[in-house]
UniProtKB/Swiss-Prot annotation:
UniProt-recorded name of the protein: ATP-dependent helicase/nuclease subunit A
Species this chain originates from: Bacillus thuringiensis subsp. konkukian (strain 97-27)
Family: Belongs to the helicase family. AddA subfamily.
Entry binding sites for ATP: 33-40
Keywords carried by this UniProt record: ATP-binding, DNA damage, DNA repair, DNA-binding, Exonuclease, Helicase, Hydrolase, Isomerase, Nuclease, Nucleotide-binding
Any Pfam family matching the protein: PDDEXK_1
Amino acid sequence: MIENWPKKPEGSQWTDDQWKAVVANGRDILVAAAAGSGKTAVLVERIIKKIINEENPVDVDRLLVVTFTNAAAQEMKNRIGEALEKVLIDEPGSQHIRKQLSLLNKASISTIHSFCLQVIRGYYYMLDVDPRFRIANQTENELLKEEVLDDILEEEYGIEDNTIFFELVDRYTSDRSDDDLQRMILALHTESRAHPNPEKWLDKLVEAYDVEGKTIEDLVYASYLLEDVKFQLETAEQHIRKATELAMLPDGPAPRVETLQADLALLGTLSSAARESWTSVYEAMQNVSWQTLKRIKKSDYNEDIVKQVDSLRNKAKDEVKKLQEELFSRRPESFLRDFQDMHPVLEKLVQLVKVFTERFQAMKRDKGMVDFTDLEHFCLQILSEQSEDGEMKPSAVALQYRNKFAEVLVDEYQDTNFVQESIIKFVTKDSESEGNLFMVGDVKQSIYRFRLAEPGLFLGKYKRFTQEGLGGGMKIDLAKNFRSRHEVLAGTNFIFKQIMGEEVGEIDYDADAELKLGATYPEGEDVAAELLCIQQTEEEVIDGEEGAEVEKAQLEARLMAQRIKAMVDSGYEVYDRKTDSMRPVQYRDFVILLRSMPWAPQIMEELKLQGIPVYADLATGYFEATEVNIMMNVFRVIDNPMQDIPLAAVLRSPIVGLNDEELATLRAHGKKGSFYEVMSSFLKGAPLEEEKELHDKLEWFYNLLQGWREFARQQSLSDLIWKVYGETGYYDFVGGLPAGKQRQANLRVLYDRARQYEATSFRGLFRFLRFIERILERGDDMGTARALGEQEDVVRIMTIHKSKGLEFPVVFVAGLGRRFNTQDLMKRFLLHKDFGFGSQFIDPRKRIKYTTLSQLAIKRKMKMELIAEEMRVLYVALTRAKEKLILIGTVKDANKEMEKWLDAREYSEWLLPDHIRAGASCYLDWIAPSLYRHRDSEMLLELGQGSIPDEIYGYDTSWKVEVVDGNTLLAPEPVQEEKQELLEALREKKAVPLQSERKDEVYDRLMWKYGYEEATSHRAKQSVTEIKRNYQSEEGSDNAFIKKLRAPIQTRPRFMEKKGLTYAERGTAVHAVMQHVDLKKPITVEVLQEQIAGMVNKELLTFEQAEEIAVEKVISFFDSDLGKRVLAAKSVEREVPFTMMLAAEEAYQDWQGKSGESILVQGVIDCMIEEEDGITLIDFKTDTIEGKFPGGFEQAKPILEERYKVQLSLYAKALEKSLQHPVKEKCLYFFDGNHVIKVEE
C-alpha cells in the first residue's frame, strides 16, 4: 500500500513529513502537528488530492471533515473552494471539478455538533424528540435545571422515613441550605454526560464503593496511590543521595555519610514494601525510625554544605512523614469500612442524579429544546445499538454513513471527548490497520480539559501507532515550525525539554516532539527571548492576597508599557512577509497574553496612561455600564415598584432627574413605607408652591410607570424596552454624552438580549430579570458592546486560550508568578472520569470528618492532570510568538525564590526531577529553574557552569534573564533617570553629590504637617441633640468630673424592678401621637382614643405605649392658646427631618481649627406652623417639672430655656435656610403642667 503513494513532485515546498500526511492512506492516520507546522494547509491539500485523484476521485460530499469551531469549518470550506477554482483554471473543461464546487456548500465540513444536528434532523423519528426542536440557551438551561432539582428535592423532603436521603442531606449540606447537595447532583449529571453511556458510568461509581469481600489491594484507589507512594519515596531517596554526594565533598561533613547510608537503606525497605502491597507498606511505615545525626564541629566543615546536607535530609524525612500521616496512620481495613458506610448514601445520590436526568430530559422534550450534550447523545443513540453482550455496536444508520464516507478527517483531535470519539468510531471502519480515519492535532496544545476534552485519546493512539503503520495505525510527526524565529523555537524547546515528560506532563518532549525551524527570517537585532522577574519590595506588598495581586498587575503593566513604548519609539523592526522586508514595529504587532483576564483592566489603564492604544475583549462590565445599570433598575421598578434601591436609583438618574435635596424632601413626606408608597401619597395631595417642580417630575414619571406596568402585562419584553427608550428619551440622551455611540450600542445589546430571551421557553419581565441575575451569578457578564475593530492599530490583551491558533510578531506572556488555580482540588467532593466520586468521610452524629482513600487518589490524579494541562497552556503561550518573546513574572522575595530555583543546577539530566516539576505552583517555577541551567543566566547568577552538562549549559538558544526592582517601575520617570546616573557613577567609583535640587522638596515633605489636624479630633457629622449636649458640657451643667464625685445610685435588681416604659419610650410615644393626630377631627377623649387604637393596629405604637399616653394632656395642649394656633394655621408640618451645613465654630465651642470648616448637622423638628405673619416653630417636651423644682415653674423656666436654646436656634436656622423665610417665634411646650416657653436669642 505504501509503495502506491504518489511521489513528492520535484521542487515541492512540502516537507517529507507534510507530503506523507497529504498522501498516506489505507489505515487510520494520526498526525501530530506541532505549533505553526501548517496543519490546515496539509489538511486542505489532502482533501484536494482525494477529490482530483485520477484513478479514484472522491466527491467532496463523501468526506466528513470535523473542525473545532464554526469559524474553522468556514475557513476550511473557503480554502477548499479557492483550491478547486485554481484547479478549474488549469482544467476549465472539468465537469468533475465543477460538480465539486456545487457540492461544497452541502458538504459535511462542520463542527461535531453540526454533524450531530444533521444526523438527528435526518433520523429524528428514531428518537422521542420534536423535529422542530431548537438549541437551548445556556442560561435557560441552568434555570430549567434549578426548577427540576427544586421539585425533586421538595418531593424527597416530603417522604416519610426517607432515612438514606436524610443521611445524605446531613452529610453533605449545611444547616442553612442544601446548595452543596444540589451542586453534587448537577456535577455528577454533567460528568456523566461526557461518557457514551452515562448510566453505566454512574453505576460503576457506586460499584466502586461496594467493597464486601474485598481487601484494600483490590481497590483501584490503593493501586494508584501506591504508585504515588513510590514516586514520593523516590523523591526522598534523591534528596538523600544528593546529601550524600555533598557530604563526601572535600569540605563536606563526612561523618554524616554513615547516617545518610542508613537513611537510604530505610527508604529502600519502604520502596520494596511499596512494590509488594499496601499492607506491606503500612507495616513498614509503623517501624520507621531515623538515626540521630552524629554531632560534628561545624567550624571544621563548609557551613553552607552542612546546611544543604541537613536541609536535604529534612526534606526526605518530611516526605516520609507526609505519607505516614496521610495514608498510613490508619489500618487498611478502616479505609474499607469508610467505603462500606458511604455505599448506601452514594447509591441514593446516584439515584437522585438519574431521576434528575430523566426529569430534565422530559422537561426539555416538552419545551421542544435540546442542549449540546443532547446533540451528541441523540446522535450516538441513532448510530448505535446494543449487542447481545450489552456492548454498543454500529446501527444500520451508522453502517450507511460508513458506506457513504470515503474518509473522515478530524481537526484538533486532541480536544475530542469520549462521546465524540464514539460517534466518530461508528461512522468509520472498525480496523485501525485498514481504517479511513485521519486525525490531526497536537496533544501539547490540548488545553480544554475543563470542557471535558480528553487528551488521553490522542496520547493512547500516539503510543500505539507506529511511523510505518505496520499492523495498526500510522503516526506522522509534523515538527517543523514555519511561524517563528530560531530564538523563539530554541527558547521554547530549551524549557520544555526540561519540564515536560510522561510522568509529569503526560507526554515526552523528545526529539519527535521538539519544534524544528522551518521559517526563514532576515537577521534581526535584539531578538533574544527574555525573562523579566520583578522583585516586589516590602513597601509595595499590600496586606491581603487581593492587594498583593493588584500590586503585581500594576508592576507588570508598567514594565510592559515601558517596553512597548521604547520599542515603538526606537523603531524596533519586525519582518513583513508580504513585502519581504523589515519594517518598524506597530502597536498591532504586540500581544499581551494572560492565563485569565482579572488583570486586563489594570493593564489597559496603564497602557492608556502611557498613550498606548489597547484593546481587550473583556467579556465583563456590560451590566456595570451606567446606562445599562439605570435601564435594568427601570425594569426592576416596572416589575416591582416596592423596591426602594432600584426606584431611588431611577429617581436620581437623568430619566427623572431628582437631586439629593428633592429625594430627601420626598422621603420626608413619609418615614414609614416604601419610596413608592411615599411617592403615591405625595402625588395625591396638593403640593406646596416650593414643591411644585418636584411634584411635576414625579407625576410625569408616575404616569409613565403605570403605563409601562400595564404594557408589560400585555406586550412583549423587547417592545417594552423600546417603548421605555422612546418615552424617556434616554436612548437619544446617552447618544449626546461622551462615548455616546458606545452607550447607544450597549442599550441596543440589551434590546437584542431581550429578543434572544423571548426566543426561549421563558416569558415575562420577572423571568427576564431572573435570567440576567443567573448570568451574573455564573460570572457570564457579556462585556460592553464592541466599539473598536480587531484590525485597528492597537496592542491586544487576551487569554492564552483565546490566542490558540493565532500568531504575533512580539508576544508578552505576563502573570507568570501567579499561582495555578487549584480551587477545584479544594471542593468538598471530587469527580474523576476514571476514579468516580471522592469526598471526606462525614459522620454528622459523631461530628467527625476525615479524608478518604478515594478523595486522596482523585485529588492526586487531578493535581497531576492540572500540572500537565498548565504545561500545555504555557506551550501554547510561548509558541504564539513569531519574532520576540518576553516572559514577565513578579515575586515577593526574589532571593528566596532564586534559592529554590537554583536546586535545578544540581541535576545533570535534561529532564528535571519529577518532584521539582510536580511541585511547581506557578509558571516561573518551571521557567526559572530551566533557564538557570543555561549560560545566559550567568549575567544574573555569576555561578559558573558547575556540574551542568555542556549540552544543557551551552544549548543553542539566546536568553536575557533579569531581575527588575519594583521601585524603579513605580517611581516617576525623572527619579529613574537620576537613579540610573547615580548607579553609573557608583559603578565607575566616581564621587556622588550630597546636594540635590530635590533637597528642599525632601525637607518640606519630611517637615510637613497636616493642615486640618484639629478636624481629626471632631466628628464631621453631628445631631442637634449632640451639639446641645456639647454646649451643656462646656458650660459645666453636665460636667463629667462632677458626675464622678456624686454618690452612685444603687439600682434595684431586675427581679425587683417595676415593669414599665422608660422615660425615653414614653416621650417617643407622645411624639408619635402628636405627629399622627388628625387635626381635621374634633380633639376629644373618644376621638383621640380611637386614633391611638388605630395607631396600634398600624403598628405605629405598641400596646404598652398606648396604655401610657395621657390623653387629657394632649387635649390640654390643643385647648391652650398655642394649640388653638396650630389648629387654625394655614399649614402644619410635623416631624420634619433636615440636614444642613454648619460652621464648625458654631457646633464646637472648643474649635481651634481653621475658619471656614463645616460639619453636617441633622435633626427632626417636632412641629412648624405657617400663619399669616410668618412661621412658628414648636418643640414638644415630656420633661418632669412638677415636684422637681422647689420654686415651681418660675424657677424651672430659665433653666429649661437655657437647656434648649441651642437646639431651637439650630432648628430655626435650618428652616430659614430651606424655606427662605424667617422664623418669627420659637416655642417649647411642656406637657407636664401645660407650660409654654417662648425662647429668645
